[in-house]
Amino acid sequence: MCDTIVATPAYTKNGKMLFAKNSDRSPNEPQFLQHIPAKDYDLQKTPTLALTYVAVPQVEHTFEITISRPSWMWGAEFGFNEFGLNIGNEAVFTKEKYVKTDGVTGMDMLRLALERCRSAKEALDFLTDFIEKYPQGGNCGYGKKFYYHNSFLIADSSDAYVLETAGKYWVWKKVK
């Protein structure tokens, strides 16, 4: 599994939130950093957004983001947006059944939250609502089948949360 860490302002020498993530994806999988400017959409022309496996409703405005993502996937393993919102994704293995087709990957959810949310709390609320409406799933492996549920570490300059998920179930805790 990957590692994502956060040090909250109460525990850093300079009083700043620190966020870091590594990746343990396939060593041959191309992954790159991508900067995507903020954008306005005409919902009459573009009512939906195609994710890796499914489409979801588009919004009128998306925020500027920088993400690290596998080349073949719409979503991202880690990223941040113009408001200083940071999110990292982890694989979670549970007894809950996996949706092997037509699901939303955790990496897709991560990118959606960065594009649509201004704060850690807003991203937490967005992700928990989204998980209840859209099934997690789809192959997340490069060159092989790999299915899992997701955990997210979500942080902005003042708040941090851990969100653990399995299917439509979720639980979160604020990081002190």
Residue spans of the language-model regions?
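Second-shell loop/turn segments in exported
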Residues: 99, 109-116
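A structural signal for well-ordered alpha-helical segments within the folded catalytic domains
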Residues: 107-108, 121
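A contiguous strand-loop segment
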Residues: 2-106, 126-176
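Short, charged, surface-exposed loops that flank catalytic or proteolytic processing sites
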Residues: 116-124
